[in-house]
Amino acid sequence: MSIFKPLCLALLSAAALFAASCGGDEPKTIQYNLSAVQPGEDFTDPRDNNVYHTVRVGDQLWMAENLRYAPNGYSLDGAYSWNERPVDLTKIVPDNAAVTELIDRLFHDPKYNGWAVAGTPIAPWVEGFIKQLKRGRMTIAEVRENIRYLNPAFDDTLTVRLLKYAELPEARHKAGMTNFEKTEKDNGGYVAKNGFLYTFAAAQKAAPEGWRLPTDEDWKKLERTLGLPAAEADLNEAWRGEGLATLLSVGGKSGFNAIRTGGNLYQRESGNFFENKDKAWYFWTATPTTLQDSVPAAYVRLSDHFTTKVWRGTSRVANNYRPVLYSVRCVKDLK
């Protein structure tokens, strides 16, 4: 594989391709400053009890691991494992337990006042049907037929809710989790080792309370604190800082421990392009922008196996029919 392919896939930046192909001047030696780096206390995410190592860099506290938080719907809400395919929404159908729950919930919805017919309550019959259903003495079809006889509007409303079942939080959670667990089994447990790959929209909502998705300026502050000259940190669509990627990657002296997780990269074609696992790392920032005046994009950081520098530039946030997926680190300010 050409060394240029990962860069083209990640950013589609003519400037980046030119920079990588031309080589430029001899690399300048940078004396990085580790005096501002200290190990931080472990952080336990109260949402799921995941524990993260942290590192203090100046007056910032960074997670030293990629985020592993799964939103309710997993990939349906923008958090993917490696090579995970989208959930087929047409196949999210309720099982008997879910239909029973929908019937029970709909019947007891106070908005419908017991589904009385001409002022006559049907509760005594329906309560009995639901009990028989839960005991396995009636089928769902039999219950629906009997309730339809008592009040056709009930079954009409139930039909609408069944058609919208895939939109319910519990349905999305079950379908997303099932898809995720199958994918993790197939790929050997990618997320446990590398964290989720997030869409830009999901990345913006993924941080625990008190933390945030770092902005482009947060990243530049990290880089400057480590000793990257300000003028170089500000370079856009460019590789910056000879040795900076080594410092930030797993085993580097900064303790940041960026993992070469790969990502689902930007490319014009509509297929999935999970690329560069064990070769490159990609991180979203919280800083959005637009390309060509209207194309949604965001600032990112990446490093690839063919350089010790870190790229600062922009990436589109979506492809044709599929999202772009990168890793997430979280940061907070120290008082």
Language model regions located:
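C-terminal motif of bacterial Sec signal peptides marking the signal peptidase cleavage site
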Residues: 18-21
